């Protein structure tokens, strides 16, 4: 996808001349926390480019695991660091004293929302407690949360429910535990420690992007499902509810979110604000399902379940590890295990619920005019997964 988004008007450049001069005089240095995630990987690819605003950026990328092969071609300084470990953060991050912008795009999952709040709050606080005092030129912190900001947890759903759509940034918080609220509160408190330090919060919906490591990689998960159906000669049936099949959905392209980050980090009109992020169009899964089937040469099924019946990929795919191992061997794919690339819980969460659409008006009003065609976006990330040999290149002959 084209990265000329700023110059070509995907974001309306409204910096005054003095801001532009300051940007040219000082190199932008990024710390991407969660660099192997969907958005982190896009940032790592985009920031070092010479035509990226503020670019080429110097980039540090932090992730818990050793650097994967599919991330090695990005010209960044990779640091393996578990940000939930306070001692490890305090040992590895202080030398990064030239950082000017932090892009925080990672999270962890626990068995309850109370534990999610504690674990994710600690991770963010570890990073900010270490970086803010040690980075004299730190200017801005971008925090990625998500659309679940507007939705109660499963446990609290019957009591607190969700806001009516379209979801807008000025809606009040729900009376429920939500680790996104915890993270925002920590961010707003931490930035007070340094005069002039600004922040932005980014709330994407379902992300279409590339990361075999992501816990929320919907495109990759559906590609793995399609490849297994192809291998077994099965029909590609839609594992979701009728509302998702027939109703309108939206998504957020990982590259678009990265552009949104960079815009907010550099444009004064975006400082100290929370923003939704989505492609700006809508689609129906019954249309994208045909695209997925064509890409893997498999017979396209549809919504074929009796009322009240639920078929979930967590159940259907639980014994398919040996099938995936065979697909990997026969197609010369990257050596992955099914549990690494198939995030069935997440696809079940998305496809067994009707999409709750958001509004991008606030971003537009503040100067960000970026958008994506969601069908083209879906195809783009499928092709990238094939190119990096994460999934087979099967198509209809």
Curated annotation (Swiss-Prot):
GO molecular-function terms, A-Z: oxidoreductase activity, acting on the CH-CH group of donors
Record key words, sorted: NAD, NADP, Oxidoreductase
Source species, domain of life: Eukaryota
SUPFAM superfamilies attached to this UniProt entry: NAD(P)-binding Rossmann-fold domains
S-S bonds: none
Catalytic residues (UniProt): 180
Annotated EC: 1.3.1.122
CDD domains, alphabetized: 5beta-POR_like_SDR_a (cd08948)
Residues at which NADP(+) binds: 36-38, 64-65, 82-83, 106-107, 144, 180, 207, 214-216
InterPro entries: NAD(P)-bd_dom_sf, PRISE-like_Rossmann-fold
Catalytic activity: (S)-8-oxocitronellyl enol + NADP(+) = (6E)-8-oxogeranial + NADPH + H(+); (S)-8-oxocitronellyl enol + NAD(+) = (6E)-8-oxogeranial + NADH + H(+)
Family: Belongs to the short-chain dehydrogenases/reductases (SDR) family.
Protein task: Iridoid synthase that catalyzes the first step in generation of the iridoid ring scaffold using the linear monoterpene (6E)-8-oxogeranial as substrate. Iridoids comprise a large family of distinctive bicyclic monoterpenes that possess a wide range of pharmacological activities, including anticancer, anti-inflammatory, antifungal and antibacterial activities. Catalyzes the conversion of the linear monoterpene (6E)-8-oxogeranial to (S)-8-oxocitronellyl enol, a precursor of nepetalactones, which are metabolites that are both insect-repellent and have euphoric effect in cats.
Protein name: (S)-8-oxocitronellyl enol synthase ISY2
Protein's gene: ISY2
């Amino acid at each position: 996808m084209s990265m000329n988004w700023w110059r070509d008007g995907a974001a309306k450049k409204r910096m005054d001349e003095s801001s532009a001069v300051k940007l040219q005089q000082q190199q932008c240095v990024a710390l991407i926390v969660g660099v192997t995630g969907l958005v982190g990987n896009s940032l790592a690819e985009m920031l070092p480019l010479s035509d990226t605003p503020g670019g080429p950026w110097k980039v540090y990328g932090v992730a818990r695991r050793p650097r994967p092969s599919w991330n090695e071609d990005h010209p960044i300084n990779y640091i393996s660091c578990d940000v939930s470990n306070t001692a490890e953060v305090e040992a590895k991050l202080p030398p990064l004293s030239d950082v000017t912008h932090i892009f925080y795009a990672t999270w962890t999952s626990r068995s309850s929302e109370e534990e999610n709040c504690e674990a994710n709050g600690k991770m963010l606080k570890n990073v900010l407690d270490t970086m803010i005092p040690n980075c004299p030129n730190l200017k801005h912190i971008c925090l990625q949360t998500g659309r679940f900001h507007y939705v109660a947890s499963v446990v609290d759903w019957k009591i607190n429910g969700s806001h009516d759509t379209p979801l807008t940034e000025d809606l009040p918080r729900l009376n429920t535990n939500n680790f996104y609220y915890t993270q925002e509160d920590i961010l707003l408190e931490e930035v007070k420690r340094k005069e002039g330090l600004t922040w932005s919060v980014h709330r994407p919906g379902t992300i279409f992007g590339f990361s075999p490591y992501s816990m929320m990689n919907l495109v990759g998960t559906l590609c793995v499902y399609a490849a297994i159906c192809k291998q077994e000669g099965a029909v590609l049936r839609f594992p979701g509810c009728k509302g998702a099949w027939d109703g309108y959905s939206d998504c957020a392209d990982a590259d678009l979110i990265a552009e949104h980050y960079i815009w907010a980090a550099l444009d004064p009109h975006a400082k100290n604000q929370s923003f939704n992020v989505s492609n700006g169009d809508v689609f129906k899964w019954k249309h994208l399902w045909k695209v997925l089937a064509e890409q893997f040469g498999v017979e396209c099924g549809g919504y074929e379940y009796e009322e009240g019946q639920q078929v979930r990929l967590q159940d259907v795919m639980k014994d398919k590890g040996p099938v995936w191992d065979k697909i990997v061997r026969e197609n010369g794919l990257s050596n992955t295990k099914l549990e690494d690339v198939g995030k069935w819980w997440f696809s079940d969460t998305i496809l067994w619920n009707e999409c709750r659409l958001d509004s991008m008006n606030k971003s537009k009003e503040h100067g960000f005019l970026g958008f994506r065609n969601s069908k083209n976006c879906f195809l783009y990330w499928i092709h990238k997964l094939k190119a990096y040999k994460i999934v087979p290149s099967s198509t209809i002959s």
